[in-house]
Regions:
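Active-site-adjacent mobile loop/cap segments within catalytic or ligand-binding domains
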Residues: 3-5, 64-154
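Noncatalytic linker/hinge segments flanking ATPase motor cores
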Residues: 34-43, 146-151
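Acidic, glycine-rich loop-and-strand cores that form catalytic or ligand-binding grooves
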Residues: 37-81
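A short, glycine/acidic-enriched catalytic loop
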Residues: 2-40, 114-127
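Extracytoplasmic/secreted envelope proteins and their assembly/folding machinery
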Residues: 10-11, 45-53, 140, 144
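Short C-terminal domain-edge/linker segments immediately following a structured domain
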Residues: 25-32, 46, 133-142
């Protein structure tokens, strides 16, 4: 069945890290880990992610997740970074992509208000025949603003 809507709503971002027991058994996993340590990828990913979550909070009005022990993927599989809302986690995406990476969670789609906004048909793109949720455009704008902020800070 479907889950009930929830009142909580947060944004956060994940960067490479938080390897757990058994996750470095294979040579390719150890190589990916070494590549992260020997490059600026981790520092750049953390910095980019900080700008992205700040832009999400500003543009979307979604608060930044600081920490929640009830969220097992944070408690058991993530590490906090010094930047609010940025967590290190060993996801396949964060492990195998080389370079600067921000895996963002822009909002909780289970949030009652967000679910309605994500289902609204209140935006159109030139040349596209169907109406789309404006909230998707707003999320894209937040990523764009965060990326520009990070680039301008370099």
């Amino acid at each position: 069945g479907y889950r009930r809507g929830i009142p909580e709503n947060y944004c956060m971002a994940f960067i490479p890290g938080r390897f757990m027991k058994g996750e470095l058994k294979e040579p390719e996993d150890r190589l990916a880990f070494a590549a992260k340590l020997l490059t600026d990828d981790l520092a750049n990913s953390q910095s980019l992610s900080k700008y992205v979550v700040l832009a999400h909070e500003r543009r979307l009005g979604v608060p930044i997740m600081e920490w929640d022990e009830r969220l097992l993927y944070l408690k058991n599989a993530s590490l906090r970074t010094p930047d609010k809302g940025v967590f290190a986690r060993n996801l396949q995406l964060t492990r195998l992509i080389h370079g600067t990476l921000c895996f963002g969670e822009s909002l909780y789609q289970d949030n009652i208000t967000e679910a309605k906004r994500l289902n609204a048909k209140d935006f159109s793109l030139p040349g596209v025949d169907v109406m789309l949720p404006n909230r998707i455009r707003e999320v894209a704008d937040a990523y764009y603003e965060g990326l520009l902020g990070w680039v301008n800070a370099q």
